[in-house]
């Protein structure tokens, strides 16, 4: 390992301390070229991880391949192995489909995956989920995915890049308020900070972390489809079973779907089957919920 960082680099040191939570030493790291992922790759290299930096080119913007090449160059100067992979994003929901394609590429190398989500991303995730009727949060480690920077601010990763003497890529999509996450980041979070007279991100991020921990504790591996058992559960636990049941069949899970399916259990009056997307529907039959 060669030392590529200056002696005085407190922001970069904060990133280095954060990544020490990552347990596997051979890892794939998602690298967009932005400040978060550059600081992440650099910190992992400084901590002597065997880093395979994967630059996913979605091909959605002019010059995207050049951005990926520059990101890969930075990663190699840190001592990482770097690779560029091009993906095709399915039409429809651009954000969601790009994310799906990106994670498929990252997991294709059969190594634990590390990504650069920060505390700011955690706060935005909470608000996004709340607006969709289901507040959510991210965990530092789930299955084969690590997010070690969840306790680090976006401003810290940007400052770390400055300390390292590198200029991160600034994604034009991050200025497009047509994307809900961007609108929350640039309009709602600053407004909340003004209202409380301070930075709203730490409290939002902490709330999201607590929700993520609760979600993990209540995770259901094998959902129960028996009406009597479901009816006797506390509502929060019953919802977990319904979510797991719908996901097991590839149905869409929304607040409206959950309410309608829950009514088959708690407010049964002979209602018809509940459509749950992807051509599937849920019916109540012989004391069980059936998805077909």
From Swiss-Prot:
SUPFAM superfamilies: Adenine nucleotide alpha hydrolases-like. Disulfide bonds: none annotated. GO terms for biological process: tRNA modification. The keyword Nucleotide-binding applies. GO terms for cellular component: cytoplasm. Keywords: ATP-binding, Cytoplasm, Ligase, Nucleotide-binding, tRNA processing. Signal peptide: none annotated. The keyword ATP-binding applies. It is found in: Cytoplasm. ATP binds at residues 32-37. Its EC number is 6.3.4.19. Belongs to the tRNA(Ile)-lysidine synthase family. This is tRNA(Ile)-lysidine synthase. It comes from Corynebacterium diphtheriae (strain ATCC 700971 / NCTC 13129 / Biotype gravis).
